[in-house]
Amino acid sequence: MFENLVIIQDQIYNVDKTECLQIGYFLDKKTNKVQIIEFFSTTKKVPKDLPKEITSLSFAFQGNKNEFIEGIQYWDTSNVADMNHMFYWCSDFNQDISMWNTSNVTNMQSMFSWASSFNQDISKWDVSNVLNMKNMFYTAEKFNQDLSTWDVSNVKREYQNIGFVNPNWKPEHWPQFNKAIS
């Protein structure tokens, strides 16, 4: 399994593991993606610069216990194609990441699943290349932003059961899926 992984840069932390001093990442030779190394759940601060080589932020902050992670608001995410499960189980996370460039992202599956406090305006994100939004906001109970203007015409796997798990999110604010399958 690990024979397909090549560490490019190690992750470096302060002593109590609350601040990442250097972002780690590796090449997955099987998928040819340059994947960020998952941060500790205690991480409160990361470098302001995301290495340009990184194309996948998959599971980056899974289970993070903080509402705010200093540094991510400045990240240039223009080279990122995969954000699946990025904030999975980040139940307190609720930070403004509206300035991220998501124009090259194709996978946002479960990006905010179980991020029950997240409720930021991400309506300006360019999601026109996203193919997979399955369970993107699953049990993100507080999320109720207006995403009705998102271009989701390329989405093949859409968010399921929006109204069931997000009762405060009005149907007129949902992305307008047309050819997606659940």
Locations of the language-model features?
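Negatively charged
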Residues: 1-182
